[in-house]
From Swiss-Prot:
This is F-actin-capping protein subunit alpha-2. Signal peptide: none annotated. The keyword Phosphoprotein applies. Pfam families: F-actin_cap_A. The modification N-acetylalanine is found at residue 2.
Length: 286
């Protein structure tokens, strides 16, 4: 092991450490970071070389953050990334600095985003917040409005998590929805993601995703937002139901087949008793 460690360059060590960090299960970033820190045994190398991994993890996980002085949390996503460690909170029209390692937001300042799509963004955000409040008690959503390739685009992100370290499991739901504002109708594209880690007496992870496409009728802002939420609700309910049904099927069939079956006698074998019989028989023969 020591020889292998000597053969690895600092660059290779950082690359391996970054992979561990990026793939840390939800709610377990600190544990993975601390383990990697011990293995690498070079804090400066880790902080400088793996800084991109800290950022990538937060962007991928839709990490929610609370900004001092503001009521609602905002998600850290690629859509709100303004560069140089700054992110956008479109609801409060502010930008802020975000520390990817400490997961802290600081220095909030006013920020004016795309005004041409703001009324559409606000309508979708209002409808989505009501939906999230009903379906995800601990959920957070952030809605962006921006021009992409010259088209007015709405991007809606949802995150909800349950971290139960005392019960040896953590899980996170993420969904991202996108559509352009065009006359008559448009295409809604979404991706739904579930990641759960269970680690009591074992190590089991569920990592699942589903891509969604649907048509959306575009009329006025309020009605379009309402129709958009119907698509979101139907797709997310269907996906979550399918996941639950698959787990039940696996429990009834696949996992059951893995369990050790009882012998023909339908009773468990008492190996201690069999051993004592064998010893007794050998003593008699002696």
């Amino acid at each position: 092991m020591a020889d292998l460690e000597e053969q690895l360059s600092d660059e290779e060590k950082v690359r391996i450490a970054a992979k561990f960090i990026i793939h840390a299960p939800p709610g377990e970033f600190n544990e993975v970071f601390n383990d990697v820190r011990l293995l690498l045994n070079n804090d400066n190398l880790l902080r400088e070389g793996a800084a991109h991994a800290f950022a990538q993890y937060n962007l991928d996980q839709f990490t929610p953050v609370k900004i001092e002085g503001y009521e609602d949390q905002v998600l850290i996503t690629e859509h709100g990334d303004l560069g140089n460690g700054k992110f956008l909170d479109p609801k409060n029209r502010i930008c802020f600095k975000f520390d990817h390692l400490r997961k802290e937001a600081t220095d909030p300042r006013p920020y004016e985003a795309e005004n041409t799509v703001e009324s559409w963004r606000t309508s979708v955000e209002t409808a989505l917040r009501a939906y999230v409040k009903e379906h995800y008690p601990n959920g957070v959503c952030t809605v962006y409005g921006k021009k992409i390739d010259g088209q007015q685009t709405i991007i809606a992100c949802i995150e909800s998590h349950q971290f139960q370290a005392k019960n040896f499991w953590n899980g996170r739901w993420r969904s991202e929805w996108k559509f352009t504002i065009s006359p008559s109708s448009t295409q809604v594209v979404g991706i739904l993601k579930i990641q759960v880690h269970y680690y009591e007496d074992g190590n089991v992870q569920l990592v699942s995703h589903k891509d969604i496409q649907d048509s959306l009728t575009v009329s006025n802002e309020a009605q379009t937002a309402k129709e958009f939420i119907k698509i979101v609700e139907a797709a997310e309910n269907e996906y979550q139901t399918a996941i639950s049904e698959n787990y039940q099927t696996m429990s009834d069939t696949t996992f059951k087949a893995l369990r050790r079956q009882l012998p023909v006698t339908r009773t468990k074998i008492d190996w201690n008793k069999i051993l004592s019989y064998k010893i007794g028989k050998e003593m008699q023969n002696a």
